[in-house]
Amino acid sequence: MPDFYSIQDVLSFAIRLEQASQAFYRQLSRKAHNPSVAQFLTTLVTEEKLHEVQLQRLLNERGAILDKSISAEEVSRYVQAMDVSESLDYKEAVKLAMDKEYAAGMLYSVLAAVMDDKTLEEMFLLLSTQEKAHKKFFEKEYHRIRVSEN
């Protein structure tokens, strides 16, 4: 994973994350046993697509150089939970989704912190808040699964 030296690098990476999230939630929705959870996951696909569109719009408008570079090591700490194995059961997938949303929220917080452009800072803070809300949903779903197992 390369270091980020430009706004374009950051936005392109964030767009790829949102695309991966869409695929992740599409696949996870097929594993959901509860129809309301499957519907929520489908809604998340739509939300992640909206994030992608917002980021793409900014990418088309921006191309500035960052005052501070963001290292690949810093970013890689937040990006690990994207691929869903076909053998993953629903409980494991929900746990993975919690981790993914935590990672995305933290990544967007880091990106917001290094932005000198207020529009980009606000965009990444909003994305961070939304990803953290998604994490709360998955925490509740994971708890529900664990309680139903006992």
Label each residue range with its predicted role.
Residues M1-N150:
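Non-heme di-metal
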